[in-house]
Amino acid sequence: MNRFALVLLGLSSLALADPTSPEVEAVLKRDFHARGQATLDRIPQDGLQRLCTESGNHPPAAIAKALEGDQLRSIPYPEGSLIGDWKRGEKIAQGGRGLTWSDKPGAANDGSCYNCHQLSPAEMSYGTVGPSLRGIGKTRGNGPDAQRYVYGKIYNAKAFNLCSQMPRLGASGTLTPEQIKDLVALLLDPASPVNR
């Protein structure tokens, strides 16, 4: 953690905007209110997010590589197969439930993957913030290396791209290891709609 603090200190001169400026604080206080499980603790950036903000999503390459390595080493890969059930994975990917004020606390969350990615050819509407994942199992295969990569990317995308916009679905506790394995199956199983 000390190395991380030194990195942030060293990059403070790269700040493009002060995310805690009085104007931003005023907007946050005016527009965001805690309600149910949707609390205000989600708003402050953690150290990695702040580093990316302050560097315009382009921190020095050596620093990004070192921090990505730290993030990669923090991923707790489960024992055995990383492939779950693609049918459950499809429900998780297409569902938009979880961590909002109207959701029941403690209920299983969904991944909302469709908000950022195209998953299957049949989808009529999908987000384009992230890359299309259509046919990913065909292009990457579904062996142990592909499974490990996809599991890790879903668990903590910042291990592969420090300034990724993809949420850290496992590291944040949003999804369980079993749910992530189901998403791995959706993306890599040849029988899933993603790869048909």
Regions found by a protein language model. Name each.
Residues 6, 77-78, 102, 169-172:
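Generic anion/oxyanion-binding catalytic loop in active/binding sites
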Residues 16-99, 153, 186-196:
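Post-cleavage N-terminal segment of exported redox proteins
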Residues 101-112:
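Local sequence-structure signature of Cys/Sec-based thiol-disulfide redox active-site neighborhoods
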